[in-house]
Amino acid sequence: MLADVLRLGEARTVKQLSAIADHVDSLARGVENLTDAELSSRTDVFRRRVADGDVLDELLPEGFAVAREAAWRVLGLRPYHVQVMGGAALHFGNIAEMMTGEGKTLACVMPAYLNAIGGKGVHIVTVNDYLAGRDAEQMGRVHRFLGLTVGVILSEMKPDERRAAYAADITYGTNNEFGFDYLRDNMAGRLEDRVQRGHCYAIVDEVDSILIDEARTPMIISGPADDATRWYAEFARLAALMTRDVHYEVDTRRRTIGVSEAGVALVEDQLGVDNLYQVVHAPLVGHLNNAVRAKELFHRDREYIVNDDGEVLIVDEFTGRVLVGRRYNEGLHQAIEAKEGVEVKPENQTLATITLQNYFRLYDRLAGMTGTARSEASEFRDIYRLGVITIPPNRPVVRRDEVDVVYKTESAKFDAVVEDVVGRHAAGQPVLIGTTSVEKSEYLSGRLTERRVPHTVLNAKHLEQEAAIVAEGGRRGAVTVATDMAGRGTDIMLGGNVDFLTDKRLRSRGLHPTRSPEEYDAAWAEVRREVAAESRTEAREVVALGGLYVLGTERHESRRIDNQLRGRSGRQGDPGETRFYVSLCDELMRRSATFDLEKLMSRLKMPEREPIEAKVVSRAIRNAQSQVEQANFDMRRSVVKYGQVLDQQRRIVYQARSRLLEGEDMQHQIFHMIGDVVTAYVNECTAGRRTADWDLETLRAALSTLYPVVWQPDPRPHMRGLTRSVLRHEVIADARRALVRRKAAIEARSGLRVMRELERAILLDCLDSKWRAHLYEMDYLAAGIGMRALAGADPVVEYHREGHRMFVRMLEAVKEQSIRSLFDATTRMLAPIMPSAARSPGTPDPRWPF
C-alpha cells in the first residue's frame, strides 16, 4: 500500500495519507453497525489473518476504522480526518508533525492498536511518568475494550511489575525507563530476571524533546569507584581562591575553561606539589578542571537545583524538568556538591551505558510525533532514518505572532514584562509566561507578587502540580510562569480543561478515584456536565479577550523551543497571541560570537527603558540561535560518532550474554577459547626464534598458571623436527584433555546440569567483570582523546582505533580469565577426591567459587 512512503515527496505523501483516511472513513458505516461484542471480536479476526500471512499494511484501513469507532464508544472522541492521517504516518515509521492541540495522543491509538495485533509488543514512549500513567489509563480503555492488554512502566515499579507490563500488548513508559530497563536486562544474572521481551515497534511522543534535546546525555548505570571524596572539598576551596581572567579563562559559548600558568602555580603552592602535570598527579588536574567548571559554568537554579534534602539535581535545559537519577559524570557532579557545601557522594564507575540514539535504533520500526520537528528533519533522517511529515491542522491557525520587543538591559526588559502582564491580567486575559531557568521564573514570580498579581509557577521545583497548573492555564485571569516548556503533553484549553476541573471539584466534595471509586464514578458524568457548561461560557469570554497570551521572557538557544512555547496558544483554531521580550544582556546574546555586545550597546544611543527597533538586533538574535543550534547539532553528531564504537562492542557483548543466559551449550566455545589462549602462550615463547632456541620450560611454567599441565616439553625439539603448529596442537590437546577429565568427574558426581551451570556462571562473571573494566578504560580514553588533535590527529579516528584495540585486548582477557577460572573452579569442586598433584597451582581451598 505505502510500503515505500518515506521515498515519496512530502506533498504527495500527504495526499496518499489523506486517501488512506478517506478509505477509513468509507468503512465507518460498517463498523458503526457492529455491537460492542462484534467490534471487540474483530481483534481476534485480525490476529488470525496475520497468522495466515496477511501483513499489517493490508489491515490498516479496517484496523484503523475499528480503533476509531472504539475510541468514540469508550471516550466519546472520534479521531478527525487529519488524526487518521497522522496515525497512518506513524504506522509507516515516520514522524508526524501535528500542531499543539491537534490530538496526537488520540491519533496514536490507531497505529498502536494495529501493530499490537502482531503480538510482538508496542512501546509508547512519553516524557514523564505522569503522561505515561495518564495515557495508559485513558487510551488504554480503548485498547482493553478491543481485547488488548495494556501495561505502564513507572519509576517506582519493581521487576515483577515491569515484567508484567512489558508482557502486555501495548506498554507505556518514559524513555529513561525503557532505556535503563534494557541496560539492567543486560546485567541480569538469570534469564528469568529480565523484564523486556524485545524491540519491535515504538511510538515516541514529543519526539524532538527525547531524540534531539536529550540525546546529548547518555544513559549510564554506575557503581562505586575509587573514593576520592576528600579532594572535591579541597579543590572547591582552591577554585574559590582563583580569579577569572587571572588564574583561568572561560569560554561561555563553548562552555569550556582553561587554567593559566598563574592558576597552576597557585594550586601547586597550596598543595605543596612541584609539578601538577606529572603523571602521578594526573587525577588532581581533573579535580582542578571540574572545580573551576562547577564554579563558572554550572549555576544553582539554572543548570541544577539543591532540594531540601541537600541533593544536587540536574535541571533539563530544554524542559525545565528535574532529571531524576541523572548525575554528571567524571567527577563533575561531586565538584558541584562540594561547591554547594552539601554531602559529596562517592564518584561512580560506569557499569552499563547507551546513548538514546543507539537505544532507539534497536527497534525494528520507530515512529514519533511532535508539534515541532521540521527544523530538525535532516537530523531525524540521518541519525534515526525517520522522515518528517507535516500533518495539516484540523482548523486554520489564527494566532498572532508579534515581533520581538528588545531592550538594552535585562532590568528594563523585566519591567516591561511585568507591566504587560499586569495590564492583561486586569482585563482578564489568561497569560502564559515562558522563562529559561528556575532562577528567572522565581525572580519574575517575586515581581508579580509585589504587584499583587495572583499566579502559579511551574518549574523543576513544582513539577508534582505540573498537569493541574497547565490544565487551568487557559482560564479567565490565569497567569502561569513556566520554565521552558515544562507541562508539554497537557493542553491549555480556553476556559480550563474540563476533565481536570471535574476531578478537582469531585475531590473538593470528598470523592476520590481510588479511595471511593464507586461514588466517584457515579458522580462523574453529572459533575462533568456542570463543569463543561461553565467552561464553555468562560471560554467564550476568553476568546473575546483575544485568547491565551504567550509571553516569552528570553529567546531560547533553539528556535524549535521558541516555537513550542508559541504553540501553546491558538490550539484548534482558537484565537491567541504570542510575543518575546528580549534584552541585549540575555544569555543567548552573551554566548553569541556574531557581534560585539559592548560596541552594539554603545552605538544604540537610546534610553535604557525604551524598546529597540533595529535590524541589526533581530539579525543578531537569529544568528545567535543558528550558531548555538549548529554547535548543539555538532555535539549530538559527535555523540553518534563516538557512540558507534561502544555500540558495536556492546552488541557483541550483549549477544554473548544472551547466549549464555539462554542456556546454549558452551562446550564448543570453551574449546575454542582454550585454543586461542594456548596459541597466544605458545606464540609468546616461540615467536622470532629458531626451534633450537625455544624456551619450552618457560612455556610449561606459564601454562601451569593456567591449568594442571601433563604435557612434557622435549628438551631437544629441533632434533625431532618439532614445528610451532605441532607444538601448538600438542599443548591445546593437553589442556582440553585436562578439562574434559574434570568435567566428566563433576558430571558423574553432581550431574550434567551442575556442570553446565558452573560453566555459565564462570563465563558470565568473567565477561561482565572485563566489560565493566573496559567501560572504565573507555571513559578515560574519551576524556583525553581530544588532546590528540594538538598533534594533528583526528580524535574520532583515534578513538575508533584505540577503542577497537582495547576491545580486542578485553576479549583476549575474557578468554584467558574464563579458562583459568574454569580450571580453578573444577579443581575446588573435586578437591576432596583428587590427589594434590592434580590440583591447579594456587587453588588449595575446595570451596564453591561463586
UniProtKB/Swiss-Prot annotation:
EC number: 7.4.2.8
Keywords: ATP-binding, Cell membrane, Cytoplasm, Membrane, Nucleotide-binding, Protein transport, Translocase, Translocation, Transport
Group of enzyme by EC: translocase
A GO molecular function held by the record: ATP binding
Record bears the keyword Transmembrane: no
Record-listed ATP binding positions: 83, 101-105, 491
Enzymatic reactions: ATP + H2O + cellular proteinSide 1 = ADP + phosphate + cellular proteinSide 2
InterPro entries linked: Helicase_ATP-bd, Helicase_C-like, P-loop_NTPase, SecA, SecA_DEAD, SecA_motor_DEAD, SecA_preprotein_X-link_dom, SecA_SF2_C
GO biological process: intracellular protein transmembrane transport; protein import; protein targeting; protein transport by the Sec complex
Complex formation: Monomer and homodimer. Part of the essential Sec protein translocation apparatus which comprises SecA, SecYEG and auxiliary proteins SecDF. Other proteins may also be involved.
HAMAP family in the cross-refs: SecA (MF_01382)
Protein's name according to its UniProt entry: Protein translocase subunit SecA 2
Protein's organism: Mycolicibacterium vanbaalenii (strain DSM 7251 / JCM 13017 / BCRC 16820 / KCTC 9966 / NRRL B-24157 / PYR-1) (Mycobacterium vanbaalenii)
